């Protein structure tokens, strides 16, 4: 089971993500949403997401600030930025926070699926680390 949190101030984006994740990944993913930076940090405290898709520009605190706050209590969540802003400063800040990928809007269904598949694969590797010494021995 993977816990996915999607933060975006556009309701249509939240519904698109939920719909694509639900129809593609079924019961293997639980998806929660938030429309503001403050709401996403509060939801992250109780929901404990494995994967977070974060918009940059939202009411209240922005996505970068929200990621910083979430990192204080959830050091293992995988962050994916989904934003219409491709400014270098935002990308650099996101990279500094350890974002897995910076996706630009508009985002297609195929890109959502690809990003979720990538995130699930990374989460699986965290949950079931491979013993490289064991592999080298064989």
Set out the residue ranges of the language-model regions.
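Conserved small/polar residues in nucleotide/adenosyl-binding loops
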Residues: 133-138
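Alpha-helical/coil-rich non-catalytic "connector" segments in signaling and regulatory proteins
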Residues: 1-132
């Amino acid at each position: 089971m993977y816990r996915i949190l999607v933060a975006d101030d556009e309701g249509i984006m939240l519904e698109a993500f939920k719909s694509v994740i639900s129809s593609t990944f079924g019961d293997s993913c639980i998806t929660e949403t938030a429309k503001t930076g403050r709401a996403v940090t509060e939801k992250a405290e109780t929901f404990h997401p494995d994967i977070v898709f974060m918009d940059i520009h939202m009411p209240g605190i922005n996505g970068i600030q929200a990621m910083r706050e979430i990192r204080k209590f959830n050091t293992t969540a995988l962050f994916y930025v989904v934003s219409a802003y491709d400014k270098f400063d935002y990308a650099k800040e996101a990279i500094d926070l350890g974002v897995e990928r910076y996706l630009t809007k508009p985002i297609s269904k195929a890109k959502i699926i690809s990003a979720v598949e990538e995130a699930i694969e990374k989460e699986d590797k965290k949950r079931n680390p491979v013993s490289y010494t064991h592999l080298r021995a064989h």
